[in-house]
Every structure is written in structure tokens, then in C-alpha cells.
Amino acid sequence: MVFYFSGTGNSQLAAKQIAAELSDEMVSINHCLKKGEKKTFRSERPLVFVAPIYAWRIPKVVEQWIRATRFEGNPNAYFVLTRGGGTQGNAAAYAAKLCAETGFIYRGLASAQMPENYIALSSAPSESECASIIARAKPVFSKLASQISQGKPFPEMPVSLGGRFISGPFNPLYYHLYIKDKGFTVSDDCVSCGKCAKRCPLNNIGMAEGRPVWKGNCTHCMACICGCPTEAIEYKSISKGKRRYDIMEE
């Protein structure tokens, strides 16, 4: 069973390809979070968790969801992370720790580069660059699916001292300093479609007088700002004039 969390579609694309090649079921963590349902999942096949890298680990919301969810059947767990560039740091160690604490058998963590979507800090590539990055990522996902199918663990990656730092003490500091929704604003280009509120996996966006209002529980998934059809949402002055990136399928 393949579970995925995705803001703008990178991890959704990865999960969709892996699930197709494994002929396995795909479950949206976004939808589970949105509905707030406590569910039990049973799978006789390995569990695959697909998500973006947030501050050099799996996203906190994904870890919290895994801890709060009941899984039955096959205890083997693989982690596939998408990243906009850079490194996965020491994310594998924290995924292994999560497995040890929740009763899973850790089978490894692997990451693949996908187009940058974090426009609250960086810039999204051009359309042609995005297409090239995705084309390079697809064989990586195929290889990972093959390893899962054969029951092989993902190979361990070497971790530098810097990687241990950014995934370790810097991770909670990054969340504390930067993962906030106070910087989001909306312009008069807003057409009150409500897409941002519908897509927010944490139900953090409400509509007041036809405009989005953020409620203070943001994970910076970029679903709202990148998915806005009129590009009416900005993050401080950082995102102004920047290309949006969104390949999410509803």
C-alpha cells in the first residue's frame, strides 16, 4: 500500500508511478488529514510512504499521522522522499527511529530530485526545466519500485556532519523560525473560488467575505499559493513575480 502526502504534486506523481508499477493501492494522506478520520489500514504488502522533504526530514504532519494511525498486516516500511534539490540530510535516521517506535520494520529511505516548489524561499524552474527534472526522476522511481517488489532494502546513503546537523538540531529550529502562515497575503486578483481552502490538507484556510484567511496551523506545503488559479496569493515579498509550480491532480 502506497501512502502519499503532497502539496503541489511532486510526491503524488512519485506515489502514482510506484503504485502503478507495484500494482498496489494508493492512499492520500492529504485526504485523511483533511477529513480527520481515525482509520485502520491493512496491507499484506509492504507499506510505502511518499512525501516531500521538509527541513531535511519527513514532514512533521506525516510523522504525526503515521503515529496516530493503525496499520495491520505487513510491517515492512519504505520511505520515498522528493526534494527540490540539495540533500536528504540524515532523514533516514529519523525514519528508522519512527519505525522502531511504531512497530514497523524499517526497509530504508531514498530520495529523488523533483522540481522546486518552495516559492516561500526559492524559485520554481521554468516549464522546460521542470519537464527535464521529472523525466530524470521517473527512472529513479522505477528502480525504487523494483527494489520494493523484490523485497530488497534501499541502500544506505552516507551522511555528512552537516547532514546530521540540519536534520538534527536545526530541524526544530527551522520549523520554529520559518514555518508560519503570517506571511501569506491575498490580492484583488482573488476570485473567491475557494480552491486554496479546499486543497489545504490541514484545514488551515477559511474563507471570510470571499477571501482566504489563514488560521495559524500551516506546514508550508505551498498548495494554496502554487494552486491559486489567478496567482492572487503571495508570501511576503519573496514570491512576487515568481513562477508557480503545480502538477497536483485533484
Over which residues does each language-model region extend?
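FMN-binding flavodoxin-like domain, especially the glycine-rich phosphate-binding loop
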Residues: 2, 6-14, 20-33, 37-51, ...
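Repeat-unit-sized solenoid/scaffold elements
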Residues: 122-125, 149, 175-186, 220
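A mid-sequence, solvent-exposed acidic-amphipathic segment
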Residues: 160-192, 198
